[in-house]
Amino acid sequence: MRFSHFLKYNAVPEWQNHYMDYSELKNLIYTLQTDELQVGDNEEGFGAGKSSNITDRFKNKFSFKNAKEDTSSGMNKDAGIVEETIELRELPTAQTVAAKPSPFRRMKEKIFYKRRSSSASSVSSTANENLQLDTYDTFVGDLTAEKQKVDDFYKRTEAKFYDKFDALVKDLKKIGVIEYDIDDDTLFNEPIASTNDEVPPLDLDDDEDDDEFYDDQSNIEDNTALLHHSQYNIKSQKKSLLKKSIVNLYIDLCQLKSFIELNRIGFAKITKKSDKVLHLNTRTELIESEQFFKDTYAFQAETIELLNSKISQLVTFYARITDRPHNISHSKQELKSYLHDHIVWERSNTWKDMLGLLSQADELTPKETEYNANKLVGKLDLEYYRWPLPRPINLKFTSINNVALPKLFFTKKAYKIYFIILVTGLLLGIKTFNDAAQHRCMALVECVAFLWASEAIPLHITAFLVPLLVVLFKVLKTSDGAIMSAASASSEILAAMWSSTIMILLAGFTLGEVLAQYNIAKVLASWLLAFAGCKPRNVLLMAMCVVFFLSMWISNVAAPVLTYSLLSPLLDAMDADSPFAQALVLGVALAANIGGMSSPISSPQNIISMSYLKPYGIGWGQFFAVALPSGILAMLLVWILLFTTFKMNKTKLEKFKPIKTKFTVKQYYIITVTVATILLWCVESQIEGAFGSSGQIAIIPIVLFFGTGLLSTQDLNAFPWSIVILAMGGIALGKAVSSSGLLSTIAKALQKKIENDGVFAILCIFGILMLVVGTFVSHTVSAIIIIPLVQEVGDKLGNPKAAPILVFGCALLSSCGMGLASSGFPNVTAISKVDRKGDRYLSVMTFLTRGVPASILAFLCVITLGYGIMASVVKGNATSA
């Protein structure tokens, strides 16, 4: 197995970015080899000097560089060399090299001398020597940077785990597992073998209990499911909690030990690779001699001994708390079993992803086969309510003894469906409009809207139902007003569902997937978070900025998931009741909702809205001009709301470290295609003669990423197709209400009611409606239902800018409903976040107390700042489409 794969299999998933970057160092080696090969055959004779005493070079490398930097720029080169030589001889390690300059120093001085005085015939040789030194310096420099990264992370993590260890020891002392008067060092430093002596088990439950019930139940069988009184008293509960703490800390420390071992193996492997490819001798001189690890903490023998000691102590604690202090080996084996189960569970998806086994189920264990069989039986069986008959009914071939009705007919969802069918039937039977098609279309809209609002069936299944109902209800009309035949209506509605909007939606998913999969979004986001510093409110603001920025390009569906993964080092260290943790989780969700208005591809509702804005000449440029200022202001106000309502100032944080990596050719290719696609979308109105629509531009990144193999069929299958289908259902519903004339009729009726009101007042009215529907139903559904209506209302008003302003404003406001845990994808993601104990960070009340005010703040930003900018950038009435 390749070591890069071995590293991924065995690495702790949450620590992936803190291991040595083996693949990057390997790429560096091959790059340096290519540079050497380009020099030609002029390197002959240099090999012996190159491999001589690399240890001296490593010792003097960094002090040489420092001396070089300290040299005044006004000095001549000879003076600089003298100063460097003096400083090198004054180093603490000079006792081993002062008598005779190292080969590295002699070589450097020789090269500097030749730079001044060599003839033209020796220039090539000097360049070759310079290249070899640069090769060594570059490789060891990068190797040292990786070592420092590993060491820094280990020290931080060890300190955190050892604090937990100390707290655990105190708790164990309180319940008597460890005696106060015993010297900890004496107890802890005993070898495990010495603990095999018989020690009486601890009696934590020595209180007498005179309860006659338990006296009577003294002969209860061992296999009873009832809890004994000793199993739910306070001491027993403490004992169970501490046992769990020991297991968790044992797993943490073992993973920390594997972190050291994996990185040490990695450094040995990569130096072996460099020696083989670049003809160096780094493994022997640096790794095997331990010279490379002398300035680290993680790789010292004392560090490993201390870690092993802590692990051994945990085994002893576990043996004592389980009343088996004489059986250390069994306790050790049991803890190893917990470790194994944890690793298998935590990394199963990682392993399956790498082995390509996620979609394969042909190698099942007997237990898995039995489980699947039972699951199939559960699917096939139907549960019934049964009522016995007074007397059996005897038929020719059977007899009926009772009446049975399936339970699924009496569920909450079933009652919702009954209600919707009843109301739809009433609307079909009662005349609501003079026009028959509009009358039936009203019943259709009510049926679909209620199904979406109640979620009696899944949203995307309702979307599938729309084209069928459109044909059955006969609501589509021809250009002369006649009702379409079923065949014509079917072709018309199905053709309308696949539109430019759907292509842009797929392109948005493609860009989001490729940016996330190739680590580009994560790297950029980590650098943004690194600027936040250590103040909780600054970290909160930067986290909100990151998810807002990511939402612009990879949608506000994927952005919060990626941001939470970046924040996991912070969240993992905090409990669910931490105010800062709650503010962080909620802030990301609210910022992602607001980020849903930030760009034309940041959310499904924006993509749908753009199809209504295009006829008014509103493209990407105008969208950004309105959405970005409104969104940024709303995000800042929500940030102020959060840090004033959550008491987070007492939280102490470590500075977030950015992910330092060099982008590869593939990553630059992805960035180039992404930026080019966005630019084409921005200037789409100017190049409409070439592409025709934004949907055609959307094909470009799809082809360039899937066609080149950067994304696979599995990635395409993983797209959130339910959202795509929901958008298609919305398009079909919009086509139906438009073709039937229902929207026009409603718009005329509303026009008479509000024709004397200004555009601003109308925007406020419909904006409140958008907030309510978006909060209680769905952001996307609110856009699907209301935006076509406001477009018709706006077109009927006298102001030529009314329609684009109303559509634009409602499109932005559709993202502002965030008062409930179910209001939008970001909120659903946030409410599902739990800490390491399995407790939720947020509650429904948290969303109500912060989400509702946040919705109002965002609403005010759109109808004030957003309205002012919209009034200046929109052009007026729709152009001919």
Curated annotation (Swiss-Prot):
Keywords: Membrane, Phosphate transport, Transmembrane, Transmembrane helix, Transport. It is found in: Membrane. The chain crosses the membrane at residues 417-437, 456-476, 493-513, 514-534, 539-559, 581-601, 663-683, 691-711, 718-738, 758-778, 805-825, 854-874. The keyword Transmembrane applies. Residues 1-288 form the SPX domain. GO terms for molecular function: phosphate transmembrane transporter activity. GO terms for cellular component: cell periphery; plasma membrane. It comes from the Eukaryota. One of its GO terms (biological process) is polyphosphate metabolic process. Induction: Expression is constitutive and independent of inorganic phosphate concentration and PHO4 activity. It is a multi-pass membrane protein. Its main location: membrane. Pfam families: CitMHS (PF03600), SPX (PF03105). Present with 3430 molecules/cell in log phase SD medium. Low-affinity phosphate transporter involved in the control of cellular phosphate levels. Belongs to the CitM (TC 2.A.11) transporter family. PANTHER family: INORGANIC PHOSPHATE TRANSPORTER PHO87-RELATED, SOLUTE CARRIER FAMILY 13 MEMBER. This is Low-affinity phosphate transporter PHO90. It comes from Saccharomyces cerevisiae (strain ATCC 204508 / S288c). The gene is PHO90.
